Amino acid sequence: MVKVGVNGFGRIGRLVTRAAILSAKVQVVAINDPFIDLNYMVYMFKYDSTHGHFRGTVKAENGKLVINGNAITIFQERDPSNIKWADAGAEYVVESTGVFTTMEKAGAHLKGGAKRVIISAPSADAPMFVMGVNHEKYDKSLKIVSNASCTTNCLAPLAKVIHDNFGIVEGLMTTVHAITATQKTVDGPSGKLWRDGRGAAQNIIPASTGAAKAVGKVIPELNGKLTGMAFRVPTPNVSVVDLTCRLEKPAKYDDIKRVVKAAADGPLKGILAYTEDQVVSCDFNGDSHSSTFDAGAGIALNDHFVKLVSWYDNEYGYSNRVVDLMVHMASKE
């Protein structure tokens, strides 16, 4: 059983904790968040507007957060180097504040006795791993890793299957992405990215994303062959990737469906899924897959030029991969 500490009890921190409880392979033993006190943690964990009421018990007792009878040590440190992870028995730390995303900043957790740190965001310099794509390249000399982004986790498994079977010459990705916490409820100031400051509930907002370029880091053969952008739309959760790419080998759309289904039923089971149903975004709320290929939504212009569509729960699917990555890392100890 992997003993885990969570730094930052936001959307991902809370859902990694939910996913950990369901997985029974990792145990959250400590949580740090300087902005949320213990009683508020109970409330935030218990009630979730997107994923519903927690189906278990959660209470505050003796200064700890007790979920389903398991007591979790609570810290409220602003400086990650001051968190005494070892005292709480936490060996792996999920860095989910969105703030400490570099090797140097995330490395502060090691000072408190953590053995490994998993950054739940893309990182400028930490090695990135996507389950089902390049997780086998992880080796135990690495103390700090990144689980990449939710969008990279959706795109990379699909890109891998297509590239392995037909070869991707080049491609452009668009993600139609649900609202996230960094956006504004109404128009407000937003640094250099002026569009990002516009009201999230009333606009379709074009935004940048490094998710497609990051695929080149986890699949080196695709480095420089993919880039992409995002449209932020007024939905609370679930996003969809549109990968438009040129294929090296000719392929009928039915050939593409066949290889994706084979991967979803085989080596990528649990990570990539396949559907021919007439689905919409809400149908994937609470889905634990990284990516669900929508066979009915894709189109082909010809045998070399296709548009492929894949859905993802950008909160819960991703949180499950964070747990899976920790389990995989622990298997290499």
UniProtKB/Swiss-Prot annotation:
Modifications the protein undergoes after translation, according to the UniProt entry: S-nitrosylation of Cys-150 leads to translocation to the nucleus.
GO cellular component terms, semicolon-separated: cytoplasm; cytosol; microtubule cytoskeleton; nucleus
Cellular location(s): Cytoplasm, Cytosol; Cytoplasm, Cytoskeleton; Nucleus
Recorded GO MF terms: glyceraldehyde-3-phosphate dehydrogenase (NAD+) (phosphorylating) activity; microtubule binding; NAD binding; NADP binding; peptidyl-cysteine S-nitrosylase activity
Keywords: Apoptosis, Cytoplasm, Cytoskeleton, Glycolysis, NAD, Nucleus, Oxidoreductase, S-nitrosylation, Transferase
Modified positions (S-nitrosocysteine) in chain numbering: C150
Residues annotated for D-glyceraldehyde 3-phosphate binding in this entry: S149, C150, T151, T180, T209, G210, R232
Gene3D superfamilies from the UniProt entry: Dihydrodipicolinate Reductase, domain 2, NAD(P)-binding Rossmann-like Domain
Keyword set includes Transmembrane helix: no
Name of the protein described by the UniProt record: Glyceraldehyde-3-phosphate dehydrogenase
Lineage: Eukaryota, Metazoa, Chordata, Craniata, Vertebrata
